[in-house]
């Protein structure tokens, strides 16, 4: 915060006003993260972790960023809206049986898949043992025949595994000097090639990116879109309407989708009760097939060059709105 204020001192009056508004927003985000009753707190090699209860909602914080939330009365509710876009792959692959997720957090997605798709096998890779303990002790995450949690780095796991998945979900962030950002080694062309090799013929990969299509942190969204496009035949975007997140969806299928087709599939799947998550057809309206306007000038991220933290700037604590 001190560095931010010192930069503001050198700005013009108009820029100063804008900078002060940004500083006030940052302060508001930080203040909001301390509301409610602190239930648990610890520090791991990766995060300062807190669990906070407020008005029937339990929220997991990494540093000052709200990472996951859960209704205390229904562990499949109270989640952030962006996680609902992790259900979109069913519109491209109606036979999802095996799912791999990198990043556990408070287990919002794990709870949702367990609730809505009880026959799906779901394996989660989480690098931080402290996060896995918190998810178990405070967010009711339980292992079963269909739900498995393994402590490992996601890329290392894929390199050592021979398993194939119908869906791979990525929602992993690390804390850095400027806030939280996507782990560099999970954002490169080489990583996506590795992930693609672990997908089935009609497999789908989805990736939560903290940013917007145009404006706040749009460069990291553009770079991720462009990098995925080097590896996968088709890439789509779902900008989240209530928070600063974009969910990218990449398919192994070369068939290009459009909004009308996606709407039709969503109608078929919901009418057949294959998808019963509330508001699913409304979420479909966020679908975008066009590349972000800035994508062509954003870098293709590689193991040799992946300035992820610089492109995203560290997201701090963006405003994420819960879904019922």
Labelled PLM ranges:
Residues 1-15:
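N-terminal secretory signal peptides that target proteins for export/translocation
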């Amino acid at each position: 915060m001190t560095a931010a204020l010192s930069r503001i001192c050198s700005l013009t009056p108009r820029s100063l006003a804008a900078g002060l508004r940004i500083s006030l927003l940052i302060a508001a985000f930080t203040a909001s993260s301390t509301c409610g009753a602190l239930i648990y707190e610890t520090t791991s090699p990766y995060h300062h972790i807190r669990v906070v209860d407020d008005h029937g909602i339990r929220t997991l914080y990494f540093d000052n960023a709200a990472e996951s939330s859960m209704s205390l009365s229904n562990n499949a509710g109270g989640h952030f809206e962006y996680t609902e876009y992790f259900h979109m792959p069913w519109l491209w692959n109606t036979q999802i049986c095996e799912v791999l997720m990198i990043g556990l957090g408070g287990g919002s997605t794990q709870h949702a898949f367990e609730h809505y798709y009880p026959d799906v096998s779901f394996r989660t890779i989480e690098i931080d043992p402290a996060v896995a303990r918190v998810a178990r002790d405070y967010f009711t995450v339980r292992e079963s025949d269909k739900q498995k949690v393994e402590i490992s780095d996601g890329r290392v796991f894929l390199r050592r595994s021979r398993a194939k998945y119908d869906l791979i979900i990525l929602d992993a962030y690390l804390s850095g000097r400027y806030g939280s950002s996507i782990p560099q080694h999970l954002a490169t062309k080489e990583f996506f090639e590795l992930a693609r090799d672990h997908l089935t013929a009609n497999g789908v990969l989805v990736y939560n990116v903290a940013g917007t299509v145009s404006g706040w942190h749009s460069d990291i969204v553009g770079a991720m879109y462009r990098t995925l496009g080097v590896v996968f035949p088709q890439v789509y975007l779902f900008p989240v309407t209530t928070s600063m997140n974009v969910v990218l969806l990449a398919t192994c299928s070369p068939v290009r989708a459009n909004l009308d087709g996606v709407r039709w599939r969503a109608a078929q799947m919901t009418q057949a009760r294959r998808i019963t998550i509330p508001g699913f057809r409304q979420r479909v309206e966020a679908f975008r097939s066009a590349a972000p306007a800035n994508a062509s000038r954003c870098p293709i991220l590689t193991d040799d060059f992946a300035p992820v933290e610089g492109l995203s700037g560290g997201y701090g604590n963006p405003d994420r709105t819960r879904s019922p």
